[in-house]
């Protein structure tokens, strides 16, 4: 497929670390055709975000418009898979960080989403796990994340993503994060209730 773009560390950015705001990671979701991109290539402007709130909610804001193709569900699923997040705690919204919105060419998943969103989720998880390991004074390899909770295998200690999110926000964004093997997927490939269904039924959809 043409116009696919590789990405580097500068494609991911820790947006803020205000106490009480949790962990916020911004990243740039590029567009398939450079001719229609209104933003300069050398200016990194986040247009998608992951925010882990202290109350355990995970807010995902994406630039791709939901036009019935299911991207408000499929793209967050990629993030949740790599984060080891509890799907019931995911909330999705339309990003308004850019005046240019790019939805088309069936590129949301195959073009950029598959690796981009997974990498964003993996980075968020790695930062949360590292923060928990520092709190417990153990190695990150001794910890694992499951359903929005981080566990220390030996001691039995556990802490939720939200409870450690402010600490994670103080850490540097890692250069890279390891992605899961496809055989270990627990969310991707499953039938999920669409995140936009209720809002469209009750008339609150944007």
Residue ranges and their predicted role:
Residues 2-26, 36-206:
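Cofactor-binding beta-sheet edge motifs in enzyme active sites
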């Amino acid at each position: 497929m043409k116009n696919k773009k590789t990405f580097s560390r500068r494609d991911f950015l820790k947006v803020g670390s205000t106490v009480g705001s949790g962990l916020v990671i911004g990243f740039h979701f590029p567009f398939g055709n450079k001719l229609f991109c209104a933003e300069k290539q050398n200016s990194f402007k986040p247009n998608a975000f992951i925010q882990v709130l202290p109350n355990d909610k995970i807010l995902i804001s994406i630039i791709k418009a939901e036009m019935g193709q299911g991207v408000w569900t499929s793209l967050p699923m990629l993030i949740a898979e790599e984060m080891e997040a509890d799907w019931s705690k995911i909330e999705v919204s339309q990003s308004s960080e850019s005046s240019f919105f790019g939805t088309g060419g069936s590129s949301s998943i195959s073009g950029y989403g598959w690796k981009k969103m997974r990498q964003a989720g993996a980075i968020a998880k790695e930062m949360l796990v590292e923060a928990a390991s520092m709190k417990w004074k153990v190695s990150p390899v001794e910890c694992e994340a499951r359903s929005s909770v981080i566990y220390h295998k030996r001691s039995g200690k556990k802490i939720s993503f939200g409870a450690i999110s402010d600490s994670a926000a103080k850490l540097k964004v890692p250069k890279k994060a390891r992605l899961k093997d496809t055989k270990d997927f627990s969310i991707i490939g499953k039938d999920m209730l669409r995140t936009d269904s209720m809002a469209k039924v009750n008339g609150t959809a944007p």
